[in-house]
Amino acid sequence: MDDEETAEIDETNSAAADMQVELGPEQLQQEMPQNGSGDGAAVSAIAAVSTAHVNSRARLENMIEEVDNMFEEVSELMVDVTELMRRANELREDPGTAALAENARPPAEIEEQPAQQEEQASLPYDSPSRASISSRHSGSDMSLDSPGSEDDSDAEAVPRWMIPANRVRSAVDMLVSQARNRDGGIATLLRRENFLQRVRSMVFSQDRIRGRASDEANADVINTVPDETPESPPAPLDVDMEEGVRFDTNLPAEHSYFGTNLNRVPGVDYLEVGSTHRMLIFMHQHILFPGEVLPFMIHGSIIDEEIQDSGRDGVIFGVGFPLMQPPDDNPHKLYGVTCQIYEKGESGRQHVFYKSRALQRIVINCDDIQGPPQYIARNPTMKCYSKVKILPEYFLPEPLKCIDMGSLNRFRDIPSMEKKFRRYQLTSTPWPYEACEEYSFEHIVEKARQKLEIHKIDTMPKCPIQLSFWLVRNLHLTEKMMRLTFLTDSVNIRLQIIDTTLKQESLFYCRYCNSSLAYCSDLFAMSKHGVQTQYCNSAGYIHETNTVYRVIAHAIGYSGEPSTEFSWFPGYQWHIIICKFCAQHVGWEFKAVEPNLAPKVFFGLAGSSVRIGKTSERTPTHGSTFVVRNLLRLVSRELE
């Protein structure tokens, strides 16, 4: 890689940092540029940012291609080294060369690396042996079918100075996080002459961490016979079997940690579909769906002035989602929701607590934004306005329910007659059975109800429109599926998309190193709003929290001391938990401090630190899109 390419990579990563390519909790703490000039200057600034965005995207694509090529080169080197080591082993078996092989020992510092590396092998990722090995389950931190960290504990032993090929990706992630402390930053990091040496060093560092974290788990693996089939998710826990008083799920929904001095705010009517309105705009790092509650804390003057300017009693504002990718035909669109404030209270430090509820989906034209966009999770101090358009919600009722069967209609809602009545209806219509089933949503609702029974959720809405959004929040869909359902105007299609995910078994993965953290089957509702809820901490930062009964053994560590201050769940203390492999914050452990309170312990996983993926998914060793995204995220965060 020549100096010109290196400089271009450095420039691209700087641009990625400015644009916040991958938003994380730390990035939200950075100050955004603020422009106090008039509307004309603001529009010019936005146009300049849009142009820079297009140019930077092209540079980012070039960098992704460079990184892909780099991983391919490393993979090829691993194959060559594997072949050399195979030949070396053959020579060791030769009595004539046994003495020479015995004397050919690695340096002392490498000899001190964890003995766990003796169990690892470097195989081509697409080989049958690799696929067989990757499907097995071990107790290590990076197993459990975690993408990018396939289990290799049953592989053929290799010398300690070998770098397993399936560790290169995670080594690069950790290596990049230290780029800021190096002279020359990421450009120096990626130079060919020292890249492999530093990756090798980082692999050994990771293995030392992994060895310390999973000694107990590895001992269990040694004493058990490996299973040839992937391990299925454990049976869900039943919190009702615990002794004690069941926690009141209404308490978290009230957000009582804001205090008791909250006043009701008059409501507002739904806005007409297709209409355009100018309103106050904030940004948010998560995707909100209509019906979801958003608690936040900002300077009181922003909302108070908005009430005075609008002349209305109620307050409605827009929340945009930068993570929602705009359509290719119109890259200047930003999607979001309207939110209505329904309660507020003083915090005692010139900030006001607000509780709001998402109402309708909207689309924002970025060319119309007036003022600096600010994140609602960072206590914004300046106003930003834009014109928004209310998106429609189309719902087609089931065709058979639109047919008047005369005197037979009285049998329509009798459960014992339902199937027979349906057959009568089908014989009287020109539509085939498949066409009627395509627009039927009752069987989808019933399958979703059965799946959610294990989560102890009994607040399922009956309105199809509200139900479609509610299911997205409680069925732990992947980020791709969440975006797809949000952009869908048809409720019927939205429910069909949800139906395709009901049979999938999913895991929570660490967003930084891809370690497996928890099974989605262990989700349960600690709030009447469901398993996924937005909460606000004492600093004003909003966390999307997923509550689970348990996490995977040896997957987490702890940071700091437990505390009951500003606890989202009354009667519980919280303790920060971190990924045991990469030491990144991934959520909190909640432990009951009041006697006879059930559950005794549960965990809240932060949506900004975890991602949802299939248990069967695999990520290639080289050329991985996830690796490139993760690398860019770490680069932009470290270079800011």
Curated annotation (Swiss-Prot):
Subcellular location: Nucleus
Post-translational modification: Ubiquitinated.
Positions of region (Disordered): 1-25, 92-159
Alphabetical list of PROSITE patterns matching this protein: CULT, LON_N
GO biological process: positive regulation of neuromuscular synaptic transmission; positive regulation of Wnt signaling pathway; protein ubiquitination
Entry's Gene Ontology cellular component terms: nucleus
Positions that bind Zn(2+): C510, C513, C579, C582
Keywords: Metal-binding, Nucleus, Ubl conjugation, Ubl conjugation pathway, Zinc
Domain Lon N-terminal: 278-506
Compositional bias (Low complexity): 113-137
Ranges of compositional bias, category Acidic residues: 1-11
InterPro entries (UniProt xref): CULT (IPR034750), Lon_prtase_N (IPR003111), Lon_prtase_N_sf (IPR046336), Yippee/Mis18/Cereblon (IPR004910)
Subunit structure: Likely a component of a DCX (DDB1-CUL4-X-box) protein ligase complex. May interact with pic/DDB1.
Family per record: Belongs to the CRBN family.
Protein name stated in the entry: Protein cereblon
